[in-house]
Amino acid sequence: RLIRLDLSEHTSKQEVLLAVKQYSETIEEGEWVIGEGWNENLWDQAEPIFASELDQYVPNHPVMLKRVCRHALAVNSLGLSKANITEDTECPPGGVIEKDEFGRLNGLLKDQAQDLLFNVLPDVSEGYLRKALHAAIKDAYKLGLTGGHTEDLNYYGGFRQTYEAFKQVI
């Protein structure tokens, strides 16, 4: 939440779509837009975000928006294409690739189907890890915390890269 697009405070689909559009204008064309925390249950109209809507607002970036529960993603058409997800792609065991009433992809991936997209995301760079660590430390200090620990040394592509980032930042 500290360095990615935080969608948890938005109270409507329109707000989320505008935030995604604005964020996309701050990054290089073609770079992934990754947002987290949308929750349609807090909106006046409890309807999820669909690929067609994301396509209208952000046509030149692949978009992946994680729902607050982490059990669903909203993905635009470019993101689905990068993951080679088509109308013929079978749902993986334990996952759902949602389609509309006409059998077309609607951009929602649930549970294990999310892995189809996660597998094509660019690897996290050491620079990104350093930026994330700096943001986390700054936030901890702001909250009055002076120490902490992590259990995620392998979360971002392996122990070595994460450890090197820690050594440089701390």
Put a short name on every predicted segment:
Residues 1-170:
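Divalent metal-binding segments
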